[in-house]
Amino acid sequence: MSSGGAGIADMQVRFDGCPALSGLLRGAGCKKGNRMESRDDPVVIRHRELERYANAALKAGRIMMESGASVSVVHRGITMIARGFGVETIGMRSGYTSIAMTVHVADQTITRMLQVGRLGVNHRLDLAVRQLCARAEKGGMSVEEVEAELARLVRETPRHPAWFTAVAVGLACASFGRLLGVDWLAFGPVWLAGAIGQYLRHHLLHRGVNIFIVAGAIAFLSATLGGLGAIALQSATVQLAMMASILLLVPGVPSTNAQTDIMDGYPTIGSARAVWVLMIMLFAATGVWFAEELLGTRG
């Protein structure tokens, strides 16, 4: 059997006595012919080009959303890339876990959707992708170039080491604690408790542990460590020290984005972000409650 077409023809002759099978084989030959014709169909070719444009723009939007950008910023970046490819964006929809867009050129229209991963905060990567969107909007960049640049940015954008971030976060917790009224005796314990909590949170999240469980566990651990340190040093602000030790869990960027999205006319994802913030605070409060019960510091 030298080829698919020849093989079908041979089988049609061989099973001439079976009309049903002969019809089935003729149908298979027609389907193969249709597939070959579709490869050269200009409509199909243009459809695939639109699909590539949409996917490249959506990838940029997904990275921005996962890096902490608001919906309006994400939509603007996606539109800029699509415009650079010479297509018109006629519709976009963002959910908490997905983004979709519809692009149009001439008489061709296509809709595509990408799933969005865990939403975090990475302002360096967010800014780098925004700058790429601005370059792509000017034209002259192919789909391959845009996708390659996105991959490079994800791979090479500098990130602070986990230990450095932990030390900085711990210092921030202690500094905010001072503003809240924590005395100097509790400053060191709060710094240490916040740093340990941030370091463990970083590794737990990268291992895929549920973010709400992490919030509750880290709140309990950091509050307990901060409280024990304050008690050991005979601080007069033990409860404040325990509260300051968990300030690392306050979801500042998601809270701001929730308000921004609702005010910008995206109430669905804004409400989803707000519920997420409330859940984080609920689990954090539960962790602190258990820590206070353990140390006997509840009034």
Segments predicted by a language model, with ranges:
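Short hydrophobic transmembrane-like helices used for membrane targeting/insertion
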Residues: M1, I8-V13
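Serine residues within intrinsically disordered or low-complexity segments
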Residues: S2-S3, S22
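Soluble N-terminal domains of membrane-associated systems
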Residues: M11-M141
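Alpha-helical transmembrane segments and their membrane-interface boundaries
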Residues: D107, G117-G299
